[in-house]
């Protein structure tokens, strides 16, 4: 871009010429290479393996807490897809299906009834 006649370059011409070179120097993987090998890590590896082995032994003891299965919790047969007659089951346990509904009604306090009593005073 230099003018051969005067030997003067146009302003910005040098920047344009260097832009191609600069863009090639930028980007992924273009940084200075770094030494990824750390000698301190090699010395610490021996200590870490001893600590890891101690942790593994402690974890094995904790995981081994298997309790015996209570046989009363195990159902004797499959229950999936089984038709259940709740009235029959209640009769076997000497329960009435309607007993629960009657008990609930006795404990109920109607808030509207209390408001009426306050209005009377």
From Swiss-Prot:
The keyword Chaperone applies. Keywords: Chaperone, Nucleus. Pfam families: CHZ (PF09649). Residues 1-121 are annotated as: Disordered. It comes from the Eukaryota. The keyword DNA damage does not apply. GO terms for cellular component: nucleus. Residues 40-70, 97-121 have a biased composition (Acidic residues). It is found in: Nucleus. Forms a heterotrimer with H2A.Z-H2B, stabilizing the association of the histone dimer. Also, with a lower affinity, forms a heterotrimer with H2A-H2B. Belongs to the CHZ1 family. Forms a chaperone-bound H2A.Z-H2B complex that acts as a source for SWR1 complex-dependent H2A to H2A.Z histone replacement in chromatin. This is Histone H2A.Z-specific chaperone CHZ1. It comes from Pyricularia oryzae (strain 70-15 / ATCC MYA-4617 / FGSC 8958) (Rice blast fungus). The lineage of its organism: Eukaryota, Fungi, Dikarya, Ascomycota, Pezizomycotina. The gene is CHZ1.
